[in-house]
UniProtKB/Swiss-Prot annotation:
TM regions (residue ranges): 87-107, 168-188, 321-341
Biased composition (Low complexity): 116-138
Pfam families per record: DUF1517
Gene Ontology BP, a term: photosynthetic acclimation
Effect of disrupting the coding gene: Normal green leaves under continuous-light conditions. Delayed non-photochemical quenching (NPQ) relaxation during induction of photosynthesis at moderate light intensity. Higher NPQ during the high light period under fluctuating light conditions leading to pale green leaves. The double mutant missing DLDG1 and FLAP1 (dldg1 flap1) has a pale-green phenotype similar to the dldlg1 simple mutant in continuous light, but a lighter pale-green aspect in fluctuating light and higher NPQ than in flap1 single mutant under short-day condition.
Protein name: FLUCTUATING-LIGHT-ACCLIMATION protein 1, chloroplastic
Similarity remark: Belongs to the FLAP family.
The species this protein was found in: Arabidopsis thaliana
Membrane topology label: Multi-pass membrane protein
Protein localization: Plastid, Chloroplast thylakoid membrane; Plastid, Chloroplast membrane; Plastid, Chloroplast envelope
Presequence boundaries: 1-48
Length: 391
């Protein structure tokens, strides 16, 4: 009887003790897999495994401190963290697709200069309408004599004397004299034609127009060059020939002060037969160079000034550059030496800056980038200025 009572006491203990632990994991497992989902299935499987492992532990403190909601929150946070990378990639892709490079990477440009083609064309047309006097030369005088002699002829009226007859002739001229006269006439005509040809050649040389282009590429370290051109554009009077001569002189001096930064160069000289054709070529070169700017942020042309503050920040790399272009139209024929090194560049700048003021018809100085905080990359230098050759 005692044994039976002991059995009855142990049976409830063995039956009731594991009851809360066996029902809870079974109930959790059915709850987790009753509604399967794509993204949360693996997470719930991990929770169930951890729950089973924690319940299999023999430590009562771990079982009492277990919080399934905390584990769920941790797994949800991990899932959100894993979704952040694709979301960031999608955002970056959208920015790249809708990104406008010209909105922030606009290359600024400066332009300063002017021209006096209209006044020169009027003066040349008025001078061409003037008449040129022919030089006087001594002409040989041809002498002639009028001799009267009585003429006797038959008369139907029986009279013998009719009247005096007047005859003209070269007195005492022989064939040798005629040769001398012809030679003198040839000398006279040839001298007259030579004088006219010399006058025509002088007039043609005066009307010829030389259009000069000098382009220099510099390292971006020469930021003081931009400051020089900015001050020149803000203070110069570009509506007078004196002001244009001053701009040309100061531009050549600014390049001469930075020989160590000059790395490439290009030059060309076009001689046109008239002022009109020279003006056309000058305007063509100016528009071509201005088209390489995304925006002209500083302009002073014929004393018409304009300024804009749109710039882009320099990236700070060492491969940033500055390009300066000098365009000039001058009366007559002018030439620049071939440029193969810094010495040749210095000689060309000196010759360009020493052209007389009364010969200058037009000057334009263009530089990019205009702002000191702007940048011109190596790729832009090679694409926009392919004619530059290293010094």
């Amino acid at each position: 009887m005692a044994s039976s009572s002991t059995f009855l006491e142990l049976t409830p203990f063995q039956w009731n003790q594991p009851l809360p632990y066996t029902q809870r994991p079974h109930h959790r497992t059915v709850l987790l897999y009753s509604k399967p989902q794509r993204r949360s299935n693996s997470i719930r499987l991990q929770i169930s495994v951890k729950y089973k492992q924690s319940t299999s532990s023999s430590d009562p403190d771990l079982r009492s401190n277990f919080n399934p909601f905390e584990q769920i929150a941790i797994q949800v946070k991990k899932a959100l963290d894993s979704l952040k990378k694709p979301a960031i990639a999608a955002v970056l892709l959208g920015l790249l697709l809708f990104y406008d490079p010209n909105s922030a990477l606009a290359a600024s440009g400066g332009r300063i200069g002017g021209n006096s083609f209209s006044s020169r064309s009027r003066s040349s047309s008025s001078s061409s309408s003037q008449s040129y006097s022919v030089p006087r030369t001594s002409n040989p005088s041809f002498s002639y004599s009028a001799r009267t002699a009585p003429y006797y002829g038959p008369s139907p009226f029986g009279g013998g004397f009719v009247g005096p007859a007047v005859g003209f002739g070269f007195g005492g001229f022989s064939s040798f004299s005629l040769i001398l006269v012809g030679f003198a006439a040839f000398v006279l005509v040839s001298g007259f034609l030579s004088d006219r040809s010399q006058d025509d050649s002088i007039l043609t040389d005066t009307q010829k127009t030389s259009v000069i282009k000098l382009q220099v590429g510099l390292l971006g370290l020469g930021r003081t060059l931009q400051q020089d051109f900015n001050r020149l554009a803000e203070s110069s009077d570009t509506s007078t020939p004196e002001g244009l001569s001053y701009v040309l002189t100061e531009a050549t001096l600014a390049l001469l002060r930075h020989p160590d930064y000059c790395i490439s160069c290009y030059s060309s000289v076009d001689v046109k037969p008239s002022i009109e054709k020279g003006e056309k070529r000058f305007n063509q070169l100016s528009i071509e160079e201005r088209g390489k700017f995304d925006e002209e942020t500083l302009v002073n042309v014929n004393s018409i000034k304009r300024q804009s503050s749109k710039i882009r920040k320099a990236s700070g790399f060492s491969n940033e550059y500055i390009v300066v272009t000098i365009l000039m139209a001058a009366e007559g024929i002018h030439k620049l030496p071939p440029i193969n090194g810094t010495t040749d560049l210095k000689e060309a700048l000196l010759k360009l800056g020493s052209i007389p003021r009364n010969k200058i018809m037009a000057v334009e100085v263009l530089w990019t980038p205009q702002n000191e905080a702007d940048a011109l990359s190596e790729r832009e230098l090679l694409e926009d200025y392919p004619l530059l050759r290293p010094l």
